[in-house]
């Protein structure tokens, strides 16, 4: 009780003191895949690139997720069912977490993982949060768009976007990214602190993100914003030690 009183005195007005941490998704979650994850995007197999997700392209071994893109021919239907309905050129992989992430005055979240991300033209891997209902919010913790950069992005609208680029190695070595999401004292906006390899990179803000449920998605999309033509061979995007913790009162 004394500890609670001290923390309550230190808490910002309009927020709750954070005294507990709960593991929402443990770092070894891929070893219990069906407990924590579903295949594909929350809305299905297609999105805004030329990759269509397939179960055979989602591989888990030794607590490491591998999403594999391979060229495909004669896809049916031949174009994506999602806007802008690009032609399908690849079979690939995506997963999403069963648990939604909802930042409130009482609950902050830390979302992290280690990734071996391809950076070749036409490869578009991502590790991101997006709205369960409507859009935005969107927070891109990892997004690689055919260059040796990771993009940290926060979308407040389609035109109000904050992006910070950091160098990303091209040798497919694993590196960590992390986002810490905390409600602001106005109980409307969310502060997002981004890290790479445990080094703080930048703070961005999500306007009106408090109370908005978000999906966590890991996917290997192709072409689209990463350019074209994409690779003629196999592309692999790996993830490990993906973890989500919730801190609350």
Curated annotation (Swiss-Prot):
PTM info: N-glycosylated.
Broad enzyme group: hydrolase
Keyword entries, A-Z: Glycoprotein, Glycosidase, Hydrolase, Signal
UniProt note: pH dependence: Optimum pH is 4.0-6.0.
Temperature effects on activity: Optimum temperature is 50 degrees Celsius.
Role noted for this protein: Specifically hydrolyzes beta-1,3-galactan in an endo-fashion. Requires at least 3 contiguous beta-1,3-residues.
Similarity section: Belongs to the glycosyl hydrolase 16 family.
Protein name: Galactan endo-beta-1,3-galactanase
Species whose genome carries this gene: Flammulina velutipes
């Amino acid at each position: 009780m004394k500890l609670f009183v001290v923390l309550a005195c230190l808490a910002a007005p309009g927020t709750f003191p954070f005294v507990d941490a709960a593991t929402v998704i443990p770092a070894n979650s891929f070893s219990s895949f069906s407990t924590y994850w579903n295949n594909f995007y929350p809305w299905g197999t297609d999105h805004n690139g030329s990759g269509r997700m397939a179960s055979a392209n989602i591989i888990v071994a030794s607590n490491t997720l591998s999403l594999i893109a391979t060229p495909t021919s004669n896809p049916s239907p031949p174009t994506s069912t999602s806007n802008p309905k690009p032609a399908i050129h690849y079979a690939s992989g995506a997963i999403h977490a069963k648990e939604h992430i909802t930042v409130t005055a009482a609950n902050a979240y830390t979302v992290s993982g280690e990734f071996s991300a391809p950076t070749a033209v036409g490869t578009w891997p991502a590790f991101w949060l997006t709205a369960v209902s409507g859009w935005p919010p969107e927070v891109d913790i990892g997004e690689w768009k055919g260059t040796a950069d990771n993009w940290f992005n926060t979308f407040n609208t389609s035109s109000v976007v904050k992006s910070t680029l950091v160098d990303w190695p091209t040798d497919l070595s694993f590196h960590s990214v992390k986002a810490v999401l905390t409600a602001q004292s106005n109980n409307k906006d969310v502060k997002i602190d981004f890290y790479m390899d445990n080094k703080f990179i930048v703070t961005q803000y999500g306007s009106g993100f408090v109370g908005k449920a978000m999906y966590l998605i890991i996917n290997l999309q192709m072409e689209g914003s990463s350019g074209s033509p994409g690779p003629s061979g196999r592309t692999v995007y790996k993830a490990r030690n993906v973890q989500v913790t919730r801190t609350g009162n």
